[in-house]
Curated annotation (Swiss-Prot):
GO MF annotation list: acetyl-CoA carboxylase activity; ATP binding; carboxyl- or carbamoyltransferase activity
Species: Thermosynechococcus vestitus (strain NIES-2133 / IAM M-273 / BP-1)
Quaternary structure (record): Acetyl-CoA carboxylase is a heterohexamer composed of biotin carboxyl carrier protein (AccB), biotin carboxylase (AccC) and two subunits each of ACCase subunit alpha (AccA) and ACCase subunit beta (AccD).
Annotated HAMAP family: AcetylCoA_CT_alpha (MF_00823)
Protein name: Acetyl-coenzyme A carboxylase carboxyl transferase subunit alpha
Entry's Gene Ontology cellular component terms: acetyl-CoA carboxylase complex
């Protein structure tokens, strides 16, 4: 467990981990010598709590990207299983493909039938390879579309969970129509009559994120990221140097706070102090509360109102004025 903790340790977390180790040493000494050090432990724990808050409330965009990519960050399946009372996974795009990078199915949210889907990363190297690191193929996006069409046909709200560095950019992806699959999803999501709530739970990268990201509301976890391209790709394109990813992350405005100011997202879902991977249960509770609140608001509108507002929401993005 100690080795795993060191492996997953982010550089900026080191002072916190050292303090936690100090607390454990004091506890061990107390047990060994039978000394009451409860007051000292309380003070150290208070310091650790304050330090954790200070670290995670002042993350740079580059550090936020590291948190969004944390191997122990809750995934789409983690959240679906945590927030739904019942869950049945559905498979396949009905064209011969069942991409494991996209998962989805029917569940109940507060006893309301909903269709939930999203990108799924792996927990270890083997699982990540099997799921292609959450980078979906054209078949994956067609599977997502099939599930969303099912939801629209049977009048069930759609909840999508975005967590991908980008769509798969391999030769086979182009051969099987990656661009067409993404574009088709965008068009159809604007047409659906049912409520659509999209949430960026980790990485929201490029067209791979947007392909399941057209909705009435776009929510985003506090330490998630959302951008037109991964910062490494942006740095390689602009400066021919992927090592300049931190500068690219600053320029891209990838954080939830920046995107809320720009009007790209509608709400920031708060994370536990220490990020979602430190307390997945609390993170899931925050997500469920946000989904239920936004779903109730969107369901109060007629289907024609939803479609018009959804369309106008995305038409407003990127609009700017120039001074003469």
């Amino acid at each position: 467990m100690a080795n795993e903790r060191r492996t997953l340790l982010l550089e900026f977390e080191k002072p916190l981990v050292e303090l936690e180790a100090q607390i454990q040493q004091v506890r061990d000494k107390s047990s060994e010598f039978g000394v009451d050090v409860s007051e000292q432990i309380r003070e150290l724990e208070e310091r650790a709590k304050q330090l954790r808050y200070e670290i995670f409330s002042k993350l740079t965009p580059g550090q936020t990207l590291q948190v969004a990519r944390h191997p122990r960050r809750p995934s789409t399946l983690d959240y679906i299983q945590a927030i739904s009372e019942e869950w049945i996974e559905l498979h396949g795009d009905r064209r011969g493909s069942d991409d494991p990078a996209i998962v989805g199915g029917i569940g109940r949210l507060n006893d309301q039938p909903v269709v939930m889907l999203g990108q799924q990363k792996g927990r270890d190297t083997k699982d990540n390879v099997a799921r292609n690191f959450g980078m979906a193929s054209p078949g994956g996006y067609r599977k997502a579309l099939r599930l969303m069409e099912h939801a629209n046909r049977f009048q069930m709200p759609i909840l999508t969970f975005i967590d991908t560095p980008a769509a798969w950019a391999g030769v086979d992806a182009e051969k099987f129509g990656q661009g067409e699959a993404i574009a088709y999803n965008l068009r159809e999501m604007f047409r659906f009559e049912v409520p659509i709530i999209c949430t960026v739970i980790g990485e929201g990268g490029s067209g791979g994120a947007l392909a399941i990201g057209v909705g009435d509301r776009l929510l985003m976890f506090e330490h998630a990221v959302y951008s037109v391209a991964p910062p490494e790709a942006c740095a390689a394109i602009l400066w021919r140097d992927a090592q300049k990813a931190p500068q690219a992350a600053e320029a891209l405005k990838i954080t939830a706070r920046d995107l809320l100011k720009l009007g790209i997202i509608d709400e920031i879902v708060p994370e536990p102090v220490g990020a979602a991977h430190s307390n997945p249960v609390e993170a899931a509770e925050n997500l469920k509360a946000a989904l239920l609140r936004n779903l109730a608001e969107v369901q109060a509108l007629s289907s024609s109102e939803r479609r018009e507002l959804r369309y106008q929401k995305f038409r407003r993005m990127g609009v700017f004025t120039e001074a003469v």
